A protein has these predicted regions:
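Helix/segment boundary signal
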Residues: 1-8, 48-136, 168
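A structural signal for conserved, well-ordered secondary-structure elements
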Residues: 1-77, 185-187, 199, 204, ...
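Solvent-exposed, acidic/flexible segments
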Residues: 13, 17, 21-25, 63, ...
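Conserved, well-folded catalytic cores of nucleic-acid-processing
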Residues: 26, 30-38, 73-80, 110-113, ...
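Short beta-strand elements
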Residues: 30-47, 72-93, 116, 124, ...
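Glycine-rich loops and low-complexity Gly/Arg-rich segments
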Residues: 34-35, 47-48, 66-68, 77-80, ...
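Hydrophobic regular secondary-structure detector
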Residues: 139-224
Length: 224
């Protein structure tokens, strides 16, 4: 799980589920996916942040705009565009239009249609806001909602090596996780806390196999 902790490792709180899930999806997940032998890192719990557009049907009717036009306008407003090159003073420069959405205002200003040379923007026909995506499940830890991830090893890989690699990567990315100063002055940083670790189970299984094999070898020697 991912939790807010102080410098001594004590729980601090102060983080909402959406903030933690964002860090899990865009930082921790990609870091752990890079570990050799990892097939997938599945995020669980929290709220996935998304841009939500509440369209006004009366405004659509007044401007004679369809819902499909709104969807197309929003999709086209969220991408980078290449514009080849331009030569200045015998030097060639690459031209690129940066158009990825970074805030609510970027969507609000997207042009849906033009009526009588006047642009009709998304904000003219609806309300744009940040909100949580519809959830299909939660992660419960001690009776409280939490955010975490499940690391799935690739088929055929050595589970113990994958686990050790994940632990090493967690130590590597720990210092770069988001932090903030809470209202009481405590500095809280998101910290990865192991929820379920198969290391002990694997070690016990290996120990059981070694014991069973050694007993079988001794019995075979005695019988012979």
């Amino acid at each position: 799980t991912v939790e807010g902790r102080d410098k001594d490792g004590n729980p601090t709180g102060g983080w909402d589920l959406q903030e933690i899930r964002t860090a899990q999806d865009f930082y921790i997940k990609y870091g752990l996916n890079a570990v050799k032998g990892v097939s997938e890192v599945a995020s669980i719990g929290g709220f996935v942040k998304e841009y939500q557009i509440d369209v006004n049907p009366d405004a659509l009717k007044a401007y004679n705009i369809s819902l499909m036009q709104v969807m197309t306008a929003v999709q086209k407003s969220n991408k980078d565009v290449g514009a080849k090159t331009i030569e200045i003073n015998q030097a060639e420069y690459l031209v690129r239009g940066l158009g990825y959405v970074k805030k609510v205002e970027d969507i609000e200003l997207a042009v849906v249609a033009v009526k009588d040379n006047v642009p009709i923007r998304v904000k003219d026909i609806g309300v744009v806001a940040l909100g949580p995506e519809t959830r299909r499940g939660i992660l419960d830890k001690g009776g409280a909602e939490a955010v975490g991830g499940v690391v799935i090893a690739r088929y055929g890989s050595n589970p113990l090596e994958v686990i050790n690699g994940v632990k090493s990567k967690i130590s590597e990315i720990a210092s770069g996780l988001p932090k903030k100063t809470l209202a009481n002055g405590v500095v809280s940083q998101l910290t990865i806390i192991p929820f379920y670790d198969r290391t002990e189970l694997i070690q016990e299984t290996i120990g059981t196999l070694e014991t069973a094999l050694s007993h079988e070898v001794l019995i075979s020697i005695i019988v012979v």
